[in-house]
């Protein structure tokens, strides 16, 4: 009786394993879906906002780290700019409490900045200071 029970259990396990090879799994995506949604066609709010700034640093939506490319601005002046927003135009930065040296630095790099409306996707959670 024990031998019969072990043979039946073995046969049941083998049948289950073989059926898993025959039946399609639910995790495979259909080929037409892979072709339809692969590539650069998928975009989200953040991608659109990044494309909107055209390679410049957006004063309302950039983190402090984006200012590292400008010598003398990171981290002190960049922190002041990030915390001082939102801005309506680039020249609003000059209304901050900046030293003369910092104002000269900003004027030097002014053409590298732009202002777009603040986006909640880029400003949520105060990640602009330490986006680690």
Curated annotation (Swiss-Prot):
Keywords: Electron transport, Membrane, Photosynthesis, Photosystem II, Signal, Thylakoid, Transport
Signal peptide: 1-29
SUPFAM superfamilies: PsbU/PolX domain-like (SSF81585)
Subcellular location: Cellular thylakoid membrane
Membrane topology: Peripheral membrane protein
One Pfam family hit: PsbU
Family: Belongs to the PsbU family.
Subunit record text: PSII is composed of 1 copy each of membrane proteins PsbA, PsbB, PsbC, PsbD, PsbE, PsbF, PsbH, PsbI, PsbJ, PsbK, PsbL, PsbM, PsbT, PsbX, PsbY, PsbZ, Psb30/Ycf12, peripheral proteins PsbO, CyanoQ (PsbQ), PsbU, PsbV and a large number of cofactors. It forms dimeric complexes.
Role summary: One of the extrinsic, lumenal subunits of photosystem II (PSII). PSII is a light-driven water plastoquinone oxidoreductase, using light energy to abstract electrons from H(2)O, generating a proton gradient subsequently used for ATP formation. The extrinsic proteins stabilize the structure of photosystem II oxygen-evolving complex (OEC), the ion environment of oxygen evolution and protect the OEC against heat-induced inactivation.
Name the UniProt record assigns to this protein: Photosystem II extrinsic protein U
Species name: Synechococcus sp. (strain CC9902)
Gene (UniProt): psbU
